[in-house]
């Protein structure tokens, strides 16, 4: 059905992603590839160089932790693990989803979303931000 599917996930909220997994698998059918994407917040440019090494070490730790959790998430899928790719990036979810979509010439984004609340309506959420700025179809799973 779809060849290249991007699935933004929060590795620290597995239950939210679990809801979207079955939908992504269905869309992938027999030969589609699912690209799991976890986005870590980018650090602001630091003018205090003495802290830069500490920030880099912390970012490396976060990236390693995210990669391990993504690997664990692969076991939640029923499709062949070779059809699931993992990406960890720094930045905003919206921008990184769009960048990866462009790099991969992706067909669709599948993203889990919480049930709406007053805070997500007022402040926005990753899912709503991705929807507003994506240049490809987005399936939101609740």
Curated annotation (Swiss-Prot):
Q: Which domain of life is it from?
A: Bacteria
CDD domains, per the entry: USP-like
* Family of this protein: Belongs to the universal stress protein A family.
What protein does this entry describe? Answer: Universal stress protein G
Where does this protein come from, organism-wise? Escherichia coli O6:H1 (strain CFT073 / ATCC 700928 / UPEC)
Q: Which gene encodes it?
A: uspG
């Amino acid at each position: 059905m779809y060849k290249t599917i991007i699935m933004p996930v929060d590795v620290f909220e597995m239950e939210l992603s679990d809801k979207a997994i079955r939908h992504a698998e269905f869309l992938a059918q027999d030969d589609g590839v699912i690209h799991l994407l976890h986005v870590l917040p980018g650090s602001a440019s630091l003018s205090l160089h003495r802290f830069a090494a500490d920030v880099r070490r912390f970012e490396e730790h976060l990236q390693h932790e995210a990669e391990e959790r993504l690997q664990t998430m692969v076991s939640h899928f029923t499709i062949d693990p070779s059809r699931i790719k993992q990406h960890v990036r720094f930045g905003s979810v919206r921008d990184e989803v769009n960048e990866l979509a462009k790099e991969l010439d992706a067909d669709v984004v599948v993203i889990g979303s919480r049930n709406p609340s007053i805070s997500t309506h007022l402040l926005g959420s990753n899912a709503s931000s991705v929807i507003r700025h994506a240049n490809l179809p987005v399936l939101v799973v609740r």
